[in-house]
Regions:
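Phosphate/pyrophosphate-binding loops at sites that engage ATP/ADP/AMP, CoA/4′-phosphopantetheine
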Residues: 45-59, 198-216, 235
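Cys/His-rich short segments
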Residues: 335-393
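Short, conserved beta-turn/loop elements at beta-strand boundaries and strand-helix junctions
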Residues: 399-405, 450
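Short aromatic-glycine-enriched beta-strand elements
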Residues: 404-416, 457-460
Length: 469
């Protein structure tokens, strides 16, 4: 039996109401902060999916996106490093298609069937942009999902998968484009989305001897709410009872991540014995039949979709949204000098910077970050072991507010964090409202982008107010 053994999702804490984008807009969508991108969100989703698991058991990491920060540099290897996976594993980018996440899941199942791997982490993430004033601007949102695929302790069995392709230009973005493009919406939806989904779903269900009444929940990628309801009704589903809410009104369309996020949302409400039809779309379809097992009970309470949707803040205004997305540029502040990164130093300190390793004294147990050669408590020398701090929570010991350093993050909150496991680190706080910051508040770690210069994205860990109690 091969299937899903764990899952995790990440939806940015920030939302923007569509009314703020254009008068009359309904609902809201998720927005990545200025220091987030598809890679940082993939790390967060992956960390959530690995909670309680032995990370050395992961044999491969597949990262799917249409908005990778790097075009020539493997993004999956950076995610694997940040998530703290062992180095002798297969890492792969699955790029340039909205069904990259489901394609990666199919590849993972085939690798496991072939005996090339036992446990594979699949993560999908996107930060797509629609041009200002367009319908796509209202729909496109940010988020990430992650699934662990394996053959032991399976919570959701993957019974069957089929794939089709449909060669037509409907949604696209060329190499030099910042915004995704589309054209005649009626033609695109009828000849592209609806026909492809109907064909893939009917072929798969017929091959498995299933009818619509045999499906507990249909999880169908949706470019918008109306088209999803239309295609679900044509397949024969009761839209209100059998179809997963596409979350367009509260989340938006998260692109490559959408099929994984919607599946995770469905699994959070599923019970053993449920059968799920899972369909993604992008120049064709991937469709799968999934069966929920008793193992789903072991995954209750994970950081998934519902907890992320309940934890939210609102972007101040549309101008701030445009600045975060790099569409508008604000003048550099007087206290923010040009920044550079030393590639040699980054390579040398990658475990400290990317994996966020501290050191623990073998003599007295004192934890230090950054790692040191001499223990500050017992003064023993060179007797340390590594400890991962990226998945540790902590409390805010003290902080300062800087109102001039960074125009995109006013004020910059420099924080001193005491980890619950021991040790202390000085970190920048993000995703905050300055008036809500208090000594002793709970914080958690988040992988973020510090700056971009000379084609290099410089990443490090920050702290954020805890989104869970």
């Amino acid at each position: 039996m091969i299937g899903i053994t764990s899952y995790g999702a990440y939806i940015p804490v920030w939302r923007i109401k569509r009314e703020a984008i254009q008068r009359g807009g309904a609902g809201e969508k998720s927005v990545a902060n200025f220091d987030e991108d598809s890679l940082t969100m993939a790390v967060s989703a992956a960390v959530n999916s690995l909670a309680g698991l032995e990370r050395d058991s992961i044999d491969s990491l597949l990262f799917a996106s249409t908005t990778f920060p790097y075009k020539e540099r493997q993004n999956a290897s950076l995610v694997a490093a940040a998530v703290d996976l062992r180095k002798n594993i297969l890492t792969m980018d699955v790029a340039n298609t909205l069904r990259g996440g489901t394609g990666a899941v199919r590849l993972a199942t085939d690798l496991i069937k072939a005996g090339s791997a036992r446990n594979i982490l699949v993560t999908a993430s996107d930060c797509r942009l629609g041009a200002p004033g367009s319908t796509l601007e209202h729909l496109c949102s940010d988020g990430a999902g992650a699934l662990v695929i394996g053959s032991t302790d399976v919570a959701v069995e993957i019974e069957s998968i089929c794939s089709t392709y449909n060669e037509m230009i409907d949604i696209w973005r060329a190499d030099e484009d910042k915004f995704i493009r589309s054209w005649d919406e009626r033609f695109v939806q009828s000849e592209g989305y609806i026909n492809s989904v109907l064909n893939a779903a009917s072929v798969l269900m017929k091959g498995q001897g299933l009818e619509a009444k045999d499906i507990t929940k249909a999880v169908i990628y949706a470019p918008d709410q109306r088209r999803m309801e239309e295609v679900a009704a044509k397949i024969g589903f009761d839209v209100k009872r059998q179809v997963q809410n596409p979350l367009i009104s509260v989340l938006g369309n998260t692109g490559t991540a959408s099929p994984l996020i919607l599946l995770i949302a469905a699994l959070e409400d599923s019970k053993p014995g449920d059968r799920i039809l899972w369909v993604s779309y992008g120049d064709g379809c991937d469709a799968g039949i999934l069966r929920v097992t008793d193992g789903i009970e072991e995954l209750r309470g994970r950081k998934g979709v519902q907890t992320s949707l309940e934890s939210k803040r609102y972007v101040k205004d549309y101008v701030t949204y445009l600045e975060w997305k790099g569409i508008l540029r604000r003048e550099r502040g007087p206290g923010k000098p040009l920044q550079e990164v030393s590639l040699t130093a980054l390579w040398r300190d990658w475990e400290e910077v990317i994996r966020f390793y501290g050191s623990r004294c073998k003599s007295c147990g004192t934890i230090q970050y950054p790692p040191q050669r001499v223990c500050t408590q017992c003064h023993d020398r060179d007797r340390f072991e590594k400890i991962r701090l990226s998945d540790q929570r902590g409390k805010l010991f003290t902080f300062s507010l800087d109102y001039i350093s960074d125009p995109l993050d006013v004020p910059v909150v420099l924080s001193v964090v005491d980890f619950d496991c021991g040790g202390r680190a000085v970190l920048t706080m993000t995703d905050h409202h300055a008036k809500e910051i208090k000594i002793g508040m709970a914080v958690e770690m988040s992988f973020r982008k510090l700056f971009f210069n000379d084609g290099i994205h410089n990443y490090f860990w920050k702290c954020t107010p805890s989104r869970t109690s």
